């Protein structure tokens, strides 16, 4: 399927690559560009660069990148057409795509979209059933008594599933949706004896569950009558996977980046109340342990995570287990310890929003400080525990990435062992990896003073050892990229076969085709114009190559002369072979080389 180029251009112009990439990668400004951990491969040192000026991104580790379309294709594993549609929806530009024109893989994506559509459509009627029907009055009163205002209910899209086995089933069927697909989406259940379908959620308050893009992919149905289970969640489906979903991430992402911290709670009800109280960087898992997928996504946003679990034994055990794992994953871990037996919802209900935000602000501890405070009685009364936990806490502190945070932890933890911070520091067994990283490759790093060392410009590693001829080819191409007039003036000055670097030869050919369709060169359009990742990398590397703002007199002509020397050298080589053929008396070879020389001379005329 072909999409009108004007639509593609409009979407590209309205989509800022920095905003787009920032939804997936925590970026820091380094010079004119932004840099962060690559979302396409595992790495500890940032190698993913975004150029706001040029509207491109590139990883010089795994080499992936491009403009907004290529980034979306890679990050979502979708086709170009789907990427255009996705970004079009993002900037409110309509793109008409018929599902029948997709291949099988795209059809799968289309099924996923239909599942999301079903969830979002039924949400409107769940909300109506809660706020406008007699059957929903008891559920609405239950929410209001627990501090849910009309505005909060609307903001969160909370609804009510009537006590009917076919409300959702009939609603979707009347609108032409595939009932089997609704079952696969988790909205319906199935009787395995007669294969009849019925509503999964009945007589429950419905809380929509959204993915990172803010689309509804599941529900949590809460009882208000005391029936079990207390919460009934959507099952695992193609669009709803608990190990990948963090509740409220779509709303909290901007605050997480701004505050450089994420606060993890146990349940989504705690998140709603905490967010309402003013704590905007809060998320929760869906009743599961924090998964590797969760941690990978968190690391792209921030390296600082605060755990605020329930103030009971189970919450304490979960805090210790989760915090230890996060610390080993290279995150800075903090803990807010709620009063015994309380969760955030209960704390806010008892003391109010202001008291809660003040408590969160003032009661934050490092994970090491929290851990030692939990274990203090055992440390004080058991020598074996004293030795064991001294080693454990020393190791925990050694895992902290900031020397300032380490010193703070030493000061907090040392009194529990009746030693000085200096004595505790002596016990620390640092990891085998050196504390300071000295870059010896293209990935950049940090010097001995903690200062960041810029990696090489995007894609330039492959052009480290260029010959005099290749350097001329690179500079010549860079000038041709300035404007179309320069290209037209010099295009016929060189023979493409004279390029010794095949990458540069292909770029020369691409420029010819590109300028045939465009009046102005820009890298964002150029990388979209080609299909080869290798060629995209070459284009990006040339974009990063800096020349004088204006060429000096005859500069481009000098490059042309160097490039054309290859042609002259070829003639000299043919003359040498002709003389050798004459010396040995091979008439056929003499004739062949003479024809080659004549042809070469004609090319240069």
Curated annotation (Swiss-Prot):
GO MF: ATP binding; DNA binding; DNA helicase activity; DNA-directed RNA polymerase activity; zinc ion binding
One of the record's GO cellular component terms: DNA-directed RNA polymerase complex
Cofactor: Zn(2+); Mg(2+)
Substrates-to-products reaction catalysed: ssDNA + n NTP = ssDNA/pppN(pN)n-1 hybrid + (n-1) diphosphate
Family annotation (Gene3D superfamilies): 3.40.1360.10, DNA primase, catalytic core, N-terminal domain (3.90.980.10), DNAb Helicase, Chain A (1.10.860.10), DnaG, RNA polymerase domain, helical bundle (1.20.50.20), Zinc finger, CHC2-type domain (3.90.580.10)
Keyword field: DNA replication, DNA-binding, DNA-directed RNA polymerase, Magnesium, Metal-binding, Nucleotidyltransferase, Primosome, Transcription, Transferase, Zinc, Zinc-finger
Domain Toprim: 260-341
GO annotation terms (biological process): DNA replication, synthesis of primer
Residues given in the record as Mg(2+) 2 binding sites: 310, 312
UniProt-annotated binding residues for Mg(2+) 1: 266, 310
Zinc finger (CHC2-type): 38-62
NCBIfam families in UniProt: dnaG (TIGR01391)
Notes concerning its domains: Contains an N-terminal zinc-binding domain, a central core domain that contains the primase activity, and a C-terminal DnaB-binding domain.
Protein role: RNA polymerase that catalyzes the synthesis of short RNA molecules used as primers for DNA polymerase during DNA replication.
Family indicated by similarity: Belongs to the DnaG primase family.
Name of this chain's protein: DNA primase
Gene: dnaG
